[in-house]
Amino acid sequence: MAKQIKFSDDARKSMVEGINKLSDTVKVTLGPKGRNVVLDKEYGAPLITNDGVSIAREIELEDEYENMGAQLVKEVATKTNDVAGDGTTTATLLAQAIIREGLKNLAAGANPIVLQKGIKKAVEKSVEAIKARSHSVTTKEEIANVGSVSAADETIGKLIAEAMEKVGNNGVITVEESKSMGTTLNVVEGMEFDRGYVSPYMVSDSDKMVAAMEDPFILVTDRKITNIQDILPLLEQVVQQGKPLFIIAEDVEGEALATLVLNKIRGTFNCVAVKAPGFGDRRKEMLEDICILTGAQLITEDLGIELKDASFDMLGRARKVNVSKDKTTIVDGNGDQSKIEERINQIQNRIPETDSEYDREKLQERLAKLSGGVAVIEVGAATETELKERKLRIEDALAATRAAVEEGIVAGGGTILLDIIEEVEKLVDDVEGDEKTGVKIILKALEEPVKQIAINAGIDGSVIVENVKNKDKGIGFDAYKGEYVDMLKAGIVDPTKVTLSALQNAASVASLLLTTEAAVVTIKKDEPAMPQPGPGAYM
């Protein structure tokens, strides 16, 4: 395929066009008075949202160079969303500001590599300063504040805080669509793990692609099931009981899988199988957790039990099991409560003894799954369009709240970025030339979030920025009420993790674009139109 190449300013200008188109679309959603964006969908109703990453993902531009720029900024939003779950609009806005200021200086003859060095130093200093001003989240009220600011809805913040109070900060919280108009919180004892059905033919709801089982028997083994004869005696006994069977195994394949699927399709019996969660030794421990929770016996050759020798009383029970393509939730297992508590104590005792951060994290995960249960936020609305928009906001708010619990909070509304300007300015005297210019680019970009929040509220952004800079640290502009307040006391806060991710990802992609000297795209060939059939062609 032939390629087209553009160089230096020509290449950068074309890409910046795309960056501006994407960023200008996303930044109108920032702040308490931010607007929504309507996204056309190929099927169904349009989606109305103020979620930065959802908007960015939808944007594809016709011009290849513009699209290349848009995709780079889309990467900023996506990466920030993956790491922190929120802050995507701020990240996009910061990237646009750094690129805009950087290009002005490149046009004036600045060296892009030295400029990049200055940007990097300023970001490192900013990260240090933000971390120093971070406050840990301890109370239910603080957790509610984070959720309220993220979702721009106080009731959502309170709902998330309540969910975290009931299942613990590391507990499993899911967001689902409700059949009613209201948004409610339900807490059920249960366990969730990241494994889905081994065959899509096992689903019970083909629209949502989920398999739901009421009151199933549960078979747990660390072996691979390939021969149906190994589990036939158990299957027959389960069928006689008229209940579904849920299988957790290393894998289910070959003849065994074909037989289970065929019988499911014919309606002979309902069976869903998933692969065992985890790997290596951790897998065995997780299977033991599931057994204790459901009252099952782990069928493993390590204990001298083979699949064909397994008896009916080795099966566990649960009130409900839901399986999607990548997730399984076991609700209300039939395990002995004293054994569950004993297992919880074992895991709690192991956490302080573990040196590895990763192992500690996994132990805490297991602990949450055994002790916390599952909190389900059921989202209701008058129309499907409103429901989707509300669900997205709650998912963002939940991610922001988790990030706040993990790494703390800072003054919200972009205030923290203005508060650290004084400290970052100290770098200006330590560097010179284009490196100094790089530092100044970040100083200018740090003003953007406050400015844009004010603009979206219909106020002159530059005036607000200067006013906040002249006030005490922590005093920011509440765009909703139109007054200056102590942001932490007013409950207008942002998770530290979200702010850091937004700044770091924006600077990373922006500085790479500034060092770009050529852009290469594929030349699209115009496909010839299909020839029209002549007379009598269909006779």
From Swiss-Prot:
Catalyzed chemical reaction(s): ATP + H2O + a folded polypeptide = ADP + phosphate + an unfolded polypeptide
Highest taxon, organism lineage: Bacteria
Biological processes, Gene Ontology terms: protein refolding
Subcellular location: Cytoplasm
InterPro entries, A to Z: Chaperonin_Cpn60_CS, Cpn60/GroEL, Cpn60/GroEL/TCP-1, GroEL-like_apical_dom_sf, GROEL-like_equatorial_sf, TCP-1-like_intermed_sf
PROSITE patterns recorded: CHAPERONINS_CPN60
Keyword terms: ATP-binding, Chaperone, Cytoplasm, Isomerase, Nucleotide-binding, Stress response
GO cellular component terms listed in the entry, alphabetical order: cytoplasm
EC assignment: 5.6.1.7
Positions annotated to bind ATP: T29, L30, G31, P32, D86, G87, T88, T89, T90, G413, D494
Pfam families: Cpn60_TCP1
GO molecular function: ATP binding; ATP-dependent protein folding chaperone; isomerase activity; unfolded protein binding
CDD domains: GroEL
Subunit structure: Forms a cylinder of 14 subunits composed of two heptameric rings stacked back-to-back. Interacts with the co-chaperonin GroES.
HAMAP family per UniProt: CH60
Recorded family membership: Belongs to the chaperonin (HSP60) family.
Protein role: Together with its co-chaperonin GroES, plays an essential role in assisting protein folding. The GroEL-GroES system forms a nano-cage that allows encapsulation of the non-native substrate proteins and provides a physical environment optimized to promote and accelerate protein folding.
PANTHER family cross-referenced by the UniProt entry: 60 KDA HEAT SHOCK PROTEIN, MITOCHONDRIAL
Official protein name in the record: Chaperonin GroEL
Organism: Finegoldia magna (strain ATCC 29328 / DSM 20472 / WAL 2508) (Peptostreptococcus magnus)
Lineage, highest ranks first: Bacteria, Bacillati, Bacillota, Tissierellia, Tissierellales
Underlying gene: groEL
